[in-house]
Amino acid sequence: MGHISRHQCLIYEGSPSRHLPALVSVIQEKLRQNNRCLYLNSPPMVAGLRSYLFAAGVDVPKEVMKGRLVLSSDNTHLANGTFDVDRMLKMLSAAVIQARDEGYQGLWATGDMSWEFGSEKNLPKLLEYEWRLEELFHTLPTLAGICQYHRDTLPADIVRQGLARHQSLFINDTLSRLNPHYVRRECFDTHLDNIADLDSTINSLCNGHNQLLN
């Protein structure tokens, strides 16, 4: 029987703010467990998460000042507007090591792929990133996080590949599930055979019908 991976995927459609309450609950729990929490997204989404954290009782200025909470819309991982896989992974690896050296249990990170990739929608680069990110999760056991895929802003092929590249799916703050469509790292490819099944699962995730994943 498999176990829930530390490298999870959230696929959604509609307003991104719908998932902020669930992410806030996860962040609160990770902070209680002495993890540093990193949230990467656009300036409006960072502001929105900050408001939801305040409403949930999190002392955001205090947590940010301490370095326990990092809310960032910095896009230095983009090179001339283009997603730089090496730069992004080096930044993430350094953040994990820094968190450990500063006494944290680990680093929990989440980012929206639409923001992380900028205007570029490069499928081969996405596959390279997710494959190497999965390797990083295996190398750094104190790293955990959620890759967010917004169906409304990403090409269908990228959303399908995002689904296939994650062993576990984030449903909400109390539920994650094993992914029946997970493709092992050594089998990563741009070609997917089960398009209809993938689309059915994506529809179920976006509509909140997680029971269909059994």
Language model regions located:
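Non-catalytic regulatory/interaction regions at protein termini and inter-domain linkers
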Residues: 1-213
